[in-house]
Amino acid sequence: MILKTFQNHSILGAIFFGIFVAPSFSDEKETKSKANSDVKKAFIDGTGQGWRELTGEDFVNVNCDPKTWTWDGGHASCTGNPVGVIRMKKPTKNFELVCEWMHKKHAGNSGIFAWASPASIEKLTAGKGRLPDGIEVQVLDLGYETNWEKNKGEPSDWFTSHGDVFPTGPAKMKPFPPVAPNGKRSFPTKRLTRGINEWNHYYIRAINGEVRLWVNGEEVSGGTNCEPAEGYLCLESEGSPIEFKNIRLRILP
């Protein structure tokens, strides 16, 4: 009789636990699952249909020295001097780009221009200025941010080392949040950049005036309503050595 009573109470307790307690575990699991699903992950290596590797044959020197950029197949090495860019031979509009990059010096600075305006490229070719107008995807070493904080005694509120996207010169863009105080830069939602002498992976998607950036497999920043929304894809030399490899492009309609 005692055993039966105990069994009945155990059964009732199990039912109560299942009805009232189990959902809390279920809700917690669903909440975590939803949070994870909100992060847009896409570690794309550029080997599917329509992708092709970019080499030195695809680029034209705009205003760098002849020895600033050297190529070994699809592996590019840049000295960083002088400040300037190389551009693809033809302008692009809608595309996807993947690449890996690695800074070779503490606080290194570089960038990828998704759409550099042809007019600004012409000026650079004529010796007027160093960098083009357009939409830039920042390629910055962690040390750049560290040096700023050390010298200024406070964190930077106008840039990060984790994949800012922003317009340069007269170019325009509506940045995705979080947005820099000046209202122009899209700051990354996560800090995923790896440090000096480590490879980082970028996936850039530029379609119909919208640019999105994935850093090491996760989407972090971007913007829409870009002007220009067509132009030259450029790699930037900006004062320090950097390497790019596995640069692959897919042109979209």
Identify the residue ranges that each predicted region occupies.
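Bacterial N-terminal signal peptides that target proteins for export
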Residues: 2-12
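Carbohydrate-interacting regions of secretory-pathway proteins
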Residues: 27-253
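Sec/Tat signal peptide C-region and signal peptidase I cleavage site
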Residues: 23-25
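Bacterial N-terminal signal peptides
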Residues: 12-20
